[in-house]
Design a protein with these regions (language model features):
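Intrinsically disordered, low-complexity linker/loop segments enriched in Gly/Pro
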Residues: 77, 98-99
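Extended, Lys/Arg-enriched charged tracts that mediate electrostatic binding to polyanionic substrates
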Residues: 83-97
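Helix-start/capping segments and mature chain N-termini
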Residues: 1-74, 102-177
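Short, charge-rich binding segments
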Residues: 80-85, 105-107
Length: 177
């Protein structure tokens, strides 16, 4: 493991992540306490869920304790980016993607684990105020036996159309029937 400056990455065009969506991710935050200490919210739980998602997509598993320790080191290096204004935090996006260069669909033996970060405020423009939600009747996000429980890019890509529809109608989010 190594911590390097943010930048582009180079991948073989045949990498499974491009052709079969072999990718999972998580999202968590580092924040400052009132006394200035930097903390993260439940990183081990996020990494356990990430491993569950990876298992569903046949991506390699990783050691949760090691991942938490690496993330702590990353946050320590980047601690100056953790804001101290109320309602703000450093958003951490760990992700794991299949890098096998093969057009055949199979379990993945080679993967890359990365973390990127950015400063964020509230997820919704309205902050902590209630939001209006569209009840989506046409598109579905998950089916029995599918990947709905996994945090994988395909689930979110498939939800984009409903999200755009909701935004055009003035809603902040979508609830699927």
């Amino acid at each position: 493991p190594r911590i390097v400056p943010f930048g582009d990455i180079s991948l073989n065009p045949g990498a499974l992540v491009f052709h079969y969506g072999a990718e999972v991710f998580e999202g968590l935050k580092a924040y400052r306490t009132p006394n200035g200490e930097v903390q993260m919210f439940r990183p081990a739980e996020n990494f356990k869920r990430m491993n569950n998602s990876a298992e569903r997509l046949c991506l390699p598993q990783f050691d949760v304790d090691d991942a938490v320790e690496y993330l702590r080191k990353f946050v320590e290096v980047e601690k100056d980016w953790v804001p101290d204004q109320y309602g703000t935090s450093l958003y951490l996006r760990p992700f794991l993607f299949g890098t096998d260069a093969d057009l055949a669909l199979h379990g993945i033996s080679h993967a890359t684990f990365m973390v990127i970060a950015c400063v964020v405020g509230s997820y919704y423009k309205s902050g902590l105020a209630p939001v209006d939600m569209l009840i989506e009747m046409d598109d579905v996000r998950a089916v029995r036996g599918g990947t709905g429980y996994a945090k994988c890019g395909g689930n979110y890509a498939a939800a984009t159309r409903a999200g755009e529809k909701a935004a055009k109608k003035g809603y902040s989010q979508v609830v699927y029937e």
